Design a protein with these regions (language model features):
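Short alpha-helix in the alpha/beta-hydrolase fold that links the catalytic acid
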Residues: 110, 240, 249, 263-272
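An N-terminal hydrophobic leader/cap segment in hydrolases
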Residues: 12, 16, 21-73
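Catalytic histidine-centered segment of alpha/beta-hydrolase-like enzymes
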Residues: 288-298
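Hydrolase active-site cap/lid region
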Residues: 177-233
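Catalytic active-site module of serine/aspartate enzymes centered on a nucleophile-bearing elbow/loop
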Residues: 296-314
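Alpha/beta-hydrolase active-site loop
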Residues: 137-158
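Short beta-strand/loop motif that positions the catalytic acidic residue
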Residues: 246-248, 253-255, 259
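Conserved alpha/beta-hydrolase
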Residues: 111-133
Length: 314
């Protein structure tokens, strides 16, 4: 009888260990798969302006502008950008930062917008995108230091520079994260963010649920751990809200009312997170989907940005 009980316990433990091993193997496979989707370079940019868009003419105009290619090295990565000088000489420059799985070419309508408002425009490829080096996407965690490096680059070339940071989607969260860094040069005067997320953890948990119907545990936890192992950061560390709590720069926050990719609720969290006393403005564009506020209401978008820029980087 004793022997039978011992044998049964052994079989149960063997089955349990086998089940756990299978589950761990499945989770490991899923972790590597979703890490590849979320955090590994993909050279097929999404989000180009369609020919049917009311802003397609801006892309065509931008294509005809004289532009130079600028490069710098940060963290041993060579980074690439377009520089478009203003029609009339000015010390004022806007750094335009693209979003997830995009490159600088996707931002041409915004480059043209700021050019028409009279600013020099610098449009970098993020690390891991376009003509910049890097194999990984860091959701703003490392990218914020690249943006700071570009701001320093402009300031070194022209110590009289007055710089604005503009970002779209992941680029929006990137410029928000840069806002409170001590290494950000004083030449940076203000920030405009369009449809940025609160932090990478919130956004990836949201996407896992919305796109794949997957709960946060255990998969998002393990993908975040994979990010820590490969890139040195957990998803919670790429946080716009934490940065905004220390931000002293005037900021304009923009979001579409029908954004289901970065939910509209996140702009209100970001707005509330801005340090007390810091000038802040909010524009929620009615009926605009993710990263479509400019195309949905071009006049309102242009007027709001123009007024903000005239106030904080004239």
């Amino acid at each position: 009888m004793k022997f039978m009980k011992k044998s049964l316990r052994k079989r149960i433990w063997t089955i349990l260990i086998a089940i756990i091993s299978v589950l761990l193997s499945l989770n490991l496979g899923a972790t590597l798969y979703f890490y590849q989707i979320a955090c590994v370079r993909n050279n097929q940019p999404i989000g180009q302006v369609k020919t049917s868009s009311p802003n397609y003419s801006l892309v065509q105009k931008f294509n005809k502008l004289p532009k130079s290619t600028e490069t710098l090295t940060n963290n041993d990565l060579k980074l690439d950008a377009w520089y478009v000088p203003a029609e009339q000489k000015t010390n004022n420059t806007v750094i335009v930062v693209h979003g997830f799985r995009q490159d600088k070419s996707v931002m041409r309508q915004y480059g043209q917008l700021f050019h028409e408002l009279g600013y020099n425009v610098l449009m970098p490829d993020n690390r891991g995108a376009g003509n910049s080096q890097g194999n990984f996407i860091s959701f703003g965690y490392h990218d914020k230091f690249d943006v700071i490096a570009w701001a320093k680059y402009l300031t070194d070339k022209n110590p009289e520079s007055h710089i604005s940071l503009y970002g779209l989607s992941m680029g929006a969260s990137t410029v928000m994260m840069a806002s409170s860094e001590k290494s950000l040069p004083s030449s940076v005067k203000n920030i405009i963010e369009d449809c940025g997320y609160t932090n990478a953890w919130d956004e990836i948990v949201y996407q896992a649920k919305e796109s794949y119907n997957i709960p946060a545990f255990p998969l998002v936890y393990s993908v975040s751990l994979e990010s820590k192992i490969r890139q040195g950061w957990f998803f919670q560390e790429a946080s716009a809200t934490k940065a905004l709590a220390k931000d002293k720069l005037p900021i304009l926050l923009i979001h579409g009312s029908k954004d289901t990719y970065v939910p509209t609720s996140m702009v209100y969290e970001n707005y509330k997170s801005v340090k007390l006393g810091t000038p802040k403005e909010l524009l929620v564009v009615k009926n605009a989907a993710h990263a479509r506020s400019f195309e949905t209401n071009p006049t309102l978008y242009r007027q709001t940005i123009s007024k903000f820029m005239k106030t904080y980087n004239p």
